[in-house]
Amino acid sequence: MDLVLSAADYYFFTPYVYPATWPEDNIIRQTVSLLVVTNLGAYILYFFCATLSYYFVYDHSLMKHPQFLKNQVSREIMFTVKSLPWISIPTVSLFLLELRGYSKLYDDIGDFPNGWIHLIMSVISFLFFTDMLIYWIHRGLHHRLLYKHIHKPHHIWKIPTPFASHAFHPVDGFLQSLPYHIYPFVFPLHKVVYLGLYVLVNVWTISIHDGDFRVPQIFRPFINGSAHHTDHHMLFDYNYGQYFTLWDRIGGSFKHPSSFEGKGPHSYVKNMTEKESNSLAENGCKSKKLCNGEFTKNE
């Protein structure tokens, strides 16, 4: 995060905000700056990626599903807008520790004999390490003592949209993001890679709420995609993983997505629409409005 803060200091905070007597390495200044940068970045990333996903990826026919809530999209957005600032407070404390040199983040790929190989392996290990921890944290949040108070708000959205991706109780949101911050305190990680992975995990979180269940057949047994996560929202006790199905298989919580078997929400909406159309046809109606008497054939 020091790369982002350095740029923010150079282009904005130092010339326009803080007095010259307040040094850039002052811990209070760093804390305030990180709060601003973290919140601004979170909102931009959320709204930009979720909006693109909602308009260009999300299947809007899912909004016809009976479990899709009234005003759900606006409710998802408002929940997220209220939660992100609270999530940022403990997150900034971890960013501050990284900024002040307590993590194993590094700048120079040449610091390691096999620099590029180490960098590639660190990406792979990051994904598997965080996937493992998120699985157990997520599963723990489903315990009856925690679920009602912390995780239940996220399960309000049985048929989620991309805007539900970050609609968490603040404690829930922070706990599920914690593995990403733990990793660089345990393992060396390049600073640019860390920022890239931070963006990636947020985009992935949006993608598993986008209702697009298309996954190449060869990856279906391994990747925990939107189809898996939608079943988690609807059925509660399955598919806790973030990226992969590995820990769900180990933990006995894996469920083959119902959508891959033609039993998911898309199929439900399709069948519901077909039945509705057939019913209108049987009654000699060309449209729902005509059948409901909202206008006459002469109109």
From Swiss-Prot:
InterPro entries: Fatty_acid_hydroxylase (IPR006694), Sterol_Desaturase_Related (IPR050307). Keywords: Endoplasmic reticulum, Iron, Lipid biosynthesis, Lipid metabolism, Membrane, Oxidoreductase, Phosphoprotein, Steroid biosynthesis, Steroid metabolism, Sterol biosynthesis, Sterol metabolism, Transmembrane, Transmembrane helix. It is found in: Endoplasmic reticulum membrane. The modification Phosphoserine is found at residue 253. A motif (Histidine box-2) lies at residues 151-155. The keyword Nucleotide-binding does not apply. The chain crosses the membrane at residues 32-52, 79-99, 117-137. Its main location: endoplasmic reticulum. It catalyses: a Delta(7)-sterol + 2 Fe(II)-[cytochrome b5] + O2 + 2 H(+) = a Delta(5),Delta(7)-sterol + 2 Fe(III)-[cytochrome b5] + 2 H2O; lathosterol + 2 Fe(II)-[cytochrome b5] + O2 + 2 H(+) = 7-dehydrocholesterol + 2 Fe(III)-[cytochrome b5] + 2 H2O; 5alpha-cholesta-7,24-dien-3beta-ol + 2 Fe(II)-[cytochrome b5] + O2 + 2 H(+) = 7-dehydrodesmosterol + 2 Fe(III)-[cytochrome b5] + 2 H2O. A motif (Histidine box-1) lies at residues 138-143. GO terms for cellular component: endoplasmic reticulum membrane; membrane. One of its GO terms (molecular function) is iron ion binding. It comes from the Eukaryota. Its cofactor is Fe cation. GO terms for biological process: cholesterol biosynthetic process via lathosterol; fatty acid metabolic process; negative regulation of ferroptosis. Residues 124-252 form the Fatty acid hydroxylase domain. Pathway: Steroid biosynthesis; cholesterol biosynthesis. A motif (Histidine box-3) lies at residues 228-233. It is a multi-pass membrane protein. Its EC number is 1.14.19.20. Catalyzes the penultimate step of the biosynthesis of cholesterol, the dehydrogenation of lathosterol into 7-dehydrocholesterol (7-DHC). Cholesterol is the major sterol component in mammalian membranes and a precursor for bile acid and steroid hormone synthesis. In addition to its essential role in cholesterol biosynthesis, it also indirectly regulates ferroptosis through the production of 7-DHC. By diverting the spread of damage caused by peroxyl radicals from the phospholipid components to its sterol nucleus, 7-DHC prevents this form of cell death. Belongs to the sterol desaturase family. The histidine box domains may contain the active site and/or be involved in metal ion binding. This is Lathosterol oxidase. It comes from Rattus norvegicus (Rat).
